[in-house]
């Protein structure tokens, strides 16, 4: 067991266990029972909390979009940089995120695995998209 359950933190423990398993074993080997074992909780805990595998993977995708948004915002550079440099900074942050969060990235962009109608999923994905769109818009405005 790589992660441990702390009272009141079941959701985060299960998401962390899922990410760990995705990184080490891949999506094809992922099961709710394995996630429970990795998190050190009862085999019924993931289903009880997330409903099914899609619900759990939706939570992983939500966390991924939140992390991506944070990375993109952190890449915002001082006002002195041009819009094209700022767009490049966002591109580098995006690529770095994809390389360092492979499990999240894999789930985020495979909508068949998640519940894309989940309001939190929608909000988190739109937040990341908005940061990228703003950088692109500013770049295009500079070009005209």
Task: Describe each region flagged by the PLM.
Residues 1-9, 20, 80:
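N-terminal intrinsically disordered/low-complexity leader segments
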Residues 2, 63-87, 132, 139-140:
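Amphipathic alpha-helical linker/stalk segments
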Residues 10-18, 35, 60-68, 72, ...:
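Generic hydrophobic, amphipathic alpha-helix propensity
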Residues 13, 17, 21-55, 59:
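Helix-turn-helix
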Residues 59, 73-104, 127-129:
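Hydrophobic alpha-helical connector segments
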Residues 73, 116-142:
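Amphipathic alpha-helical packing segments from all-alpha helical-bundle domains
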Residues 99-116:
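Amphipathic alpha-helical segments used for helix-helix packing
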């Amino acid at each position: 067991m790589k992660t441990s359950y702390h009272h009141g933190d079941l959701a985060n423990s299960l998401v962390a266990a899922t990410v760990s398993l995705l990184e080490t074993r891949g999506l094809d080997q992922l099961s709710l029972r394995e996630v429970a074992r990795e998190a050190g909780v009862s085999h019924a805990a993931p289903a009880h909390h997330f409903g099914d595998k899609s619900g759990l993977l939706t939570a992983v995708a939500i966390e991924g979009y939140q992390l991506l948004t944070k990375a993109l915002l952190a890449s915002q550079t001082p006002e002195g940089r041009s819009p094209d440099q700022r767009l490049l900074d966002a591109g580098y942050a995006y690529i770095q995120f994809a390389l360092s969060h492979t499990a999240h990235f894999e789930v985020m962009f495979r909508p068949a695995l998640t519940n894309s109608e989940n309001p939190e999923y929608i909000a988190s994905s739109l937040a990341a998209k908005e940061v990228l769109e703003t950088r692109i818009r500013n770049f295009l405005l500079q070009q005209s």
